[in-house]
Amino acid sequence: MSNYQQESSYQYSDRSNNGQQQEQQEKKEVEHSSYTHTDVKVNMPNLIAPFISSSAGLAQELVGEGFQASVSRITGASGELTVIDTEAETEEARRDLEAKAREQELLSRQFEKELERKTEAYRKQQEVETEKIRKELEKQHLRDVEFRKELMEQTIENQKRQIDLEARYAKKELERERNKVKRVLERSKFHTDIQVNMEAAAGSTHSGSSSVAVSESEKFQTNN
């Protein structure tokens, strides 16, 4: 049963006695429109408004146009039933429609406020997260600078060590070359020829000398 109290009048026509009678159903149509504008930065969900069939519509569907109902227990003949809305029912339906529109508008405003609240909360959260990321990037930049500084210092230190290493082994190589030259000089032979010629009025003098020197270093071997 519906929550609304409805009054319906039914008219039965006796085709054999009174002839066919037809009554026009009086209806009052109420058109209601509402407009709501929402300007938000997020996509508004497009929700389909729920449709609920009222009891009046259900009654119209059951005993509406072209429906023949048997009422032989009442009149002994078949008759056509027509649902007629009373003025009270029409007024009640109009009030319900207006109340429904007001509630829909209220729900829309509540939804908009909730959406704005969540959007603002999300924006603030994003600002906090962005600030954290910015600070972390600054720390990362400082770490990068320190790393590059340490890398440069290590590179310079390594180059110094490489230079010291090259110098040390170059010194050893020079020492070996010096020893080689010394050994060659100790084992070398010297040959000197000296010729002296003197010319004078009384005569001439010739003097010459030749010398050969052999130098070889002595080697000592010790057996333990």
UniProtKB/Swiss-Prot annotation:
Its main location: cytoplasm. Residues 1-13, 200-215 have a biased composition (Low complexity). It comes from Hypsibius exemplaris. GO terms for cellular component: cytoplasm. Residues 80-191 form a coiled coil. Residues 24-38 have a biased composition (Basic and acidic residues). It is found in: Cytoplasm. CAHS proteins contain 2 repeats of 19-mer peptides designated as CAHS-motifs that comprise each two octapeptides connected by a tripeptide. This is Cytosolic-abundant heat soluble protein 77611. Trehalose, a disaccharide essential for several organisms to survive drying, is detected at low levels or not at all in some tardigrade species, indicating that tardigrades possess potentially novel mechanisms for surviving desiccation involving tardigrade-specific intrinsically disordered proteins (TDPs). Residues 122-140 are annotated as: CAHS motif 1. Residues 1-38, 200-224 are annotated as: Disordered. Residues 159-177 are annotated as: CAHS motif 2. Keywords: Coiled coil, Cytoplasm, Repeat, Stress response.
